[in-house]
Curated annotation (Swiss-Prot):
Source superkingdom: Bacteria
Biological processes, Gene Ontology terms: isopentenyl diphosphate biosynthetic process, methylerythritol 4-phosphate pathway; terpenoid biosynthetic process
Molecular function as annotated in GO: 4 iron, 4 sulfur cluster binding; 4-hydroxy-3-methylbut-2-en-1-yl diphosphate synthase activity (ferredoxin); 4-hydroxy-3-methylbut-2-enyl-diphosphate synthase activity (flavodoxin); iron ion binding
Classification via InterPro entries: Dihydropteroate_synth-like_sf, IspG_bac, IspG_bac-typ, NO2/SO3_Rdtase_4Fe4S_sf, RibuloseP-bd_barrel
Pathway: Isoprenoid biosynthesis; isopentenyl diphosphate biosynthesis via DXP pathway; isopentenyl diphosphate from 1-deoxy-D-xylulose 5-phosphate: step 5/6
Full protein name: 4-hydroxy-3-methylbut-2-en-1-yl diphosphate synthase (flavodoxin)
Length: 348
């Protein structure tokens, strides 16, 4: 059983993060924030997928102003992603965002940092310090490893906020390299009490990015590290949300929707099990029930091998078996197997 690191609790809109709260799933819009209708539509789609926190890039004042129209139209907490310009942070706070992602050390003048912190404190808005291995300060000691530099940079930003008596802090330390990311998070986890947002950055397209993210995020979560997660992919954001829940489900940390179990096929397979499994997965994506469903390619061994499944089909040429918890329910013609399975799921 996984024992989670105990972090302080913060509130992000209507969501509790840290402490004993469930690990939250986050994504980021891929739209131009200034395109208000497109951004609202994408956030609503993500809400339907189970996204619990959404981050929006705020490159200029027009984007910050757009938040005034976006915030009332969506339900989940909005985090404004700010780089360098403190005025964008102030405008985003005035627009009603639920959180900021910025590094106070990059803002410059201490008075500007104070202005942002003062506004955030008045509104009880948390700030996420987000350190990225690709954009570390140039003045860090060269003898340090990348992970050590990430931790040192994060601690510098944290001390600025703590020096202003601000404690609504969340921290992330992301790199493309999985071992570097794991090393950075394990180091900082023992140094600070604040919630940690976990992810691997710039992972690429789903084919490679899903693997890299699952290895990195999964390892950290198994060690009990992580209060929110994002699977960063060069793909539509709903794919990030789906992948995040699959990682959490695989570690028994969250349950949302069905889990599909399907065999890898072998020479005993006499049907298009790949196509059948894909068809079932597509249907399961529209179902919220936290059940385990099996699609097996062998009517002889399938039910026994998938006896942990709530429901399943074992496919044979011409016909197959519909089973529950490994016990046969019915023999079904091959071309009716998927429909029979879905009807049985609907009856649960």
């Amino acid at each position: 059983m996984i024992t989670r690191r105990q972090s302080t609790e913060i509130r992000l809109g209507n969501l509790t993060i840290g402490g004993s709260a469930p690990i939250s799933v986050q994504s980021m819009t891929k739209t131009d924030t200034r395109n208000i209708p497109a951004t609202i539509a994408q956030i609503k789609e993500l809400e339907e997928c189970g996204c619990e926190i959404i981050r929006l890039a705020i490159p200029d004042m027009e984007a910050a102003s757009a938040l005034k129209s976006i915030r009332p139209k969506v339900k989940i907490p909005i985090v404004a992603d700010i780089h360098f310009d403190y005025r964008l942070a102030l405008a985003s706070l005035s627009a009603g965002v639920d959180g900021l992602r910025l590094n106070p050390g990059n803002i410059g003048d201490p008075e500007r940092v104070k202005a942002v912190v003062k506004s955030a404190k008045e509104r009880e808005i948390p700030i996420r310090i987000g350190v990225n291995a690709g954009s570390l300060p140039k003045d860090l000691p060269p003898e340090l490893t990348i992970a050590q530099k990430m931790v040192k940079a994060a601690m510098g930003h944290i001390k600025i906020l703590e020096g202003l008596d601000f404690g609504l802090i969340k921290v992330s330390l992301k790199a493309f390299d999985v071992p570097t990311t794991i090393e950075a998070y394990t180091q900082i986890a023992s140094l600070i009490p604040y919630p940690l947002h976990v992810g691997i950055t710039e992972t690429g397209t789903p084919k490679t990015g899903l693997v890299r993210s699952a290895v990195g995020i999964g390892n950290l979560l198994y060690m009990g590290i992580g209060d929110t997660i994002r699977v960063s992919l060069t793909a539509p954001p709903h794919e990030e949300v789906f992948a995040a829940y699959e990682i959490l489900k695989s570690l028994n940390l969250r349950q949302r929707g069905p889990i599909l179990v399907s065999c890898p096929t072998c020479s005993r397979t006499e049907v298009d099990i790949v196509g059948i499994a894909s068809q079932v997965q597509e249907a399961l994506n529209k179902i919220d029930k936290p059940i385990r469903v099996a699609v097996m390619g062998c009517a002889v061994n399938g039910p026994g091998e998938a006896k942990e499944a709530d429901l399943g089909i074992a496919c044979g040429k011409g016909q197959g078996l519909l089973f529950r918890k490994g016990e046969k329910i019915a023999v079904v013609p091959e071309d009716e197997l998927v429909d029979a399975l879905l009807r049985e799921i609907a009856s649960l």
